């Protein structure tokens, strides 16, 4: 049908209700504008960070180096037992993993991490400073010391389990690891999977990852829940949390923030 508003070409009302975590999305209106249409709303104005890697004005800071108030223990949701000092938090022995207090779906996530220096060169594979960043309780971006000086002859693991891999699914396009003891960064854009009211998968999750500023996954489809030596598959999910994994190694984390991203209007014909 034709729109009455000037410059608006098509208006389509969507009546599909899809459960997307905390809130349901219903009756979305998709509007197609003319080129250079002055009736098209401008985006919100934010203040960008003064330095790359710092949070913009619309970010939610999950860890600023001072305390773990945005986190709880995976063990029953209690107080975090990790070490907090010198602007970072560090996995403590037998403390267990941690997760955010708030559920988080579509997001831009920045997290910095550091593996211990002085590692015994005989320790390789998955024992080499292992951790992970897990999205919505299920989808893991691997944290590991995958630094190599001679094309993996000194330090090798399976490709879909090295640093920045979507664990058990997709290796990174390149190995952008820094040396042990040096701070590294992940910048992640995550689009959550969608499920219908009947529990069937409507859309797979998608992810883009920059490791130390280098694109290692580009709008990649996630195949399902992270699993060890099992084929990934999806199961219905309403919401989930960001986790930092305790794999028995003293990994450090700092400067963690997110920007919650809106769901794109989704048209079902």
Annotate each predicted stretch with a short phrase.
Residues 2-3, 20, 28:
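N-terminal leader/targeting segments
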Residues 2-12:
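Bacterial N-terminal signal peptides that target proteins for export
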Residues 24-269:
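Carbohydrate-interacting regions of secretory-pathway proteins
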